[in-house]
């Protein structure tokens, strides 16, 4: 068995019926010629008779109240693989409604925590694969890599593969900090979380120093280098979920146009997309008579995976990033966000990997504290979670079926009701919006505002757009 590290454990301890902590993503394929009726059943049969590699063969085993491990088992593929078909005409609206419904329920902890749905009967002879995986089992970048690994760049490859079949690599040994109380670390008191950072293994000498440094910044005893919790202004986006219902939306921007804009302004693709998101959020607030006079703050996970990207679990740090001023012009907003992300990266480079993970745990805990305690709920740590993942740039296939669409269904975090995740897929930059309806009940409008923000940024920066963006709302 493999002991579960604190970040992975937090996704289990924080999960509630109204706040699932699984990730989900779907891929849509155009069925190969001559296989319109047979491709789905063949895929279902192959998946039901497949074997799962790590981490998809890991089942949760509790060793105590706040201690858990992954136990290697042989999954019951009959349970994990489901096949369903949409009734005619199989419209995209029907598909999105089905996906939203399937993504609502919690994953069964009596099995390895993942499910796969083959969704047949989509208009224009298409078929989809929806994968749900618990965030404790794998992080977003690892999940995207798993989705990439089961696809081929050759239309002649006839292998009926699934994301769980190819091993994600042997789990690297990771030291596990001393057990921290569930109540103190994850649901209760900020003081308990800070003390928890000092209880790491004795060999990790730099972590305590980093924790003390953060504390000194919080007390204004030295200049701030890190963004600290409980400093964001509460907005509509901090209305938390009352049920498991979620609202989703999707935006696709031409990747070439995004890269051209980043190059012309001396920034990055990440900065450009954050600017588009930030501008859209401020306009959404204004439309709902809920404008803020301070910059919005983004909670940004940052991958600590090495280039091989192997292994399950979560290998991430995080940072709180203040974005642009509410009234800033598009280019001014981009410059402000570029400066903020540069500071975040510079700070991260100066911290040990373990220190960065401990800092991420502190920030994650601060979101939970704000969600649980009314007083601190008025001073949230962040207004939105924004994640950037790198996807494939080449055309991919599943047994000769070309990939035509991809979208994630982001987790809605504690303390904030909105999560925006983006990834580059082929020639598109796909932005996925996941929200509690209490925070964003019109994801389609937010998607439209992102499209408009991108066009306005291009216009002010002096770049042209030979292509157009698209938006969808499940």
UniProtKB/Swiss-Prot annotation:
Record keywords: Acyltransferase, Glycerol metabolism, Lipid biosynthesis, Lipid metabolism, Transferase
Knockout mutant characteristics: Inactivation of the mymA operon causes altered cell wall structure, reduced contents and altered composition of mycolic acids along with the accumulation of saturated C24 and C26 fatty acids, and enhanced susceptibility to antibiotics, detergents and acidic pH. Also impairs ability to survive in macrophages.
pH-related activity note: Optimum pH is 6.5-7.2.
InterPro entries: Acyl_transf_WS/DGAT, O-acyltransferase_WSD1-like, O-acyltransferase_WSD1_C, O-acyltransferase_WSD1_N
One Gene Ontology MF term: diacylglycerol O-acyltransferase activity
Location of the active site: 135 (proton acceptor)
Catalytic activity entry: an acyl-CoA + a 1,2-diacyl-sn-glycerol = a triacyl-sn-glycerol + CoA; di-(9Z)-octadecenoylglycerol + (9Z)-octadecenoyl-CoA = 1,2,3-tri-(9Z-octadecenoyl)-glycerol + CoA
EC numbers, comma separated: 2.3.1.20
Induction: Expression is controlled by VirS. Induced at acidic pH and in macrophages. Induced by low levels of nitric oxide (NO), but not by hypoxia.
Biological processes annotated in GO: biological process involved in interaction with host; glycerol metabolic process; glycerolipid biosynthetic process; response to acidic pH; response to hypoxia; response to nitric oxide; triglyceride biosynthetic process
Pathway: Glycerolipid metabolism; triacylglycerol biosynthesis
GO cellular component, one term: plasma membrane
Similarity remark: Belongs to the long-chain O-acyltransferase family.
Physiological role: Required for maintaining the appropriate mycolic acid composition and permeability of the envelope on its exposure to acidic pH. Upon expression in E.coli functions as a triacylglycerol synthase, making triacylglycerol (TG) from diolein and long-chain fatty acyl-CoA. Has very weak wax synthase activity, incorporating palmityl alcohol into wax esters in the presence of palmitoyl-CoA.
NCBIfam families linked to this entry: acyl_WS_DGAT
Name of protein: Probable diacyglycerol O-acyltransferase Tgs4
């Amino acid at each position: 068995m493999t002991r579960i590290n604190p970040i992975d454990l937090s996704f289990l301890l924080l999960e509630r019926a109204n706040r699932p902590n699984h990730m989900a993503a779907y891929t849509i394929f155009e069925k190969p010629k001559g296989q319109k009726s047979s491709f789905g059943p063949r895929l279902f049969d192959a998946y039901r008779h497949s074997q799962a590699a790590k981490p998809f063969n890991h089942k949760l085993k509790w060793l105590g109240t706040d201690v858990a491990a992954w136990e290697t088992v042989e999954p019951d593929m009959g349970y994990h693989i489901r096949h369903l078909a949409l009734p005619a005409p199989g419209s995209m609206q029907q598909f999105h409604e089905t996906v939203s419904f399937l993504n609502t329920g919690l994953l069964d902890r009596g099995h390895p925590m993942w499910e796969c749905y083959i969704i047949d009967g989509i208009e224009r002879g298409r078929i989809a694969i929806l994968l749900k995986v618990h965030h404790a089992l794998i992080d977003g970048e690892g999940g995207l890599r798993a989705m990439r690994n089961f696809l081929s760049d050759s239309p002649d490859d006839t292998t009926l593969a699934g994301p769980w079949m190819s091993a994600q690599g042997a789990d690297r040994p990771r030291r596990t900090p001393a057990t921290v109380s569930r109540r103190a670390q994850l649901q209760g008191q900020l003081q308990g979380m800070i003390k928890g950072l000092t209880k790491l293994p004795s060999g990790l000498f730099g972590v305590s120093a980093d924790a003390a440094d953060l504390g000194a910044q919080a007390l204004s005893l030295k200049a701030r280098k890190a963004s600290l919790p409980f400093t964001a202004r509460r907005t509509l986006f901090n209305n938390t979920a009352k049920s498991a219902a979620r609202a989703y939306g999707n935006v696709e921007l031409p990747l070439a146009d995004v890269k051209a804009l980043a190059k012309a302004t001396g920034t990055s693709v990440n900065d450009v997309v954050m600017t588009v998101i930030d501008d859209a959020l401020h306009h959404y607030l204004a439309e709902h008579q809920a404008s803020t006079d301070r910059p919005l703050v983004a909670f940004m996970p940052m991958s600590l995976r090495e280039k091989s990207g192997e292994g399950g679990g979560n290998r991430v740090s995080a940072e709180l990033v203040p974005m642009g001023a509410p009234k800033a012009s598009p280019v001014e907003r981009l410059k402000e966000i570029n400066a903020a992300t540069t500071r975040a990266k510079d700070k991260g480079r100066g911290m040990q990997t373990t220190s960065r993970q401990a800092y991420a745990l502190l920030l994650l805990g601060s979101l939970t504290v704000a969600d649980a305690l009314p007083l601190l709920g008025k001073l949230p740590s962040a207004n939105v979670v924004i994640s950037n993942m790198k996807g494939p740039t080449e055309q991919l296939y599943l047994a000769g079926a070309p990939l035509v669409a991809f979208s994630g269904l982001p987790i809605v975090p504690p303390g904030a009701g909105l999560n925006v995740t983006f990834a580059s897929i082929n020639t598109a930059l796909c932005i996925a919006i996941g929200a509690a309806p209490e925070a964003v009940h019109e994801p389609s409008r937010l998607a439209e505002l992102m499209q408009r923000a991108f066009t306005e940024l291009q216009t002010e920066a002096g770049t042209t757009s030979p292509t157009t963006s698209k938006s969808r709302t499940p």
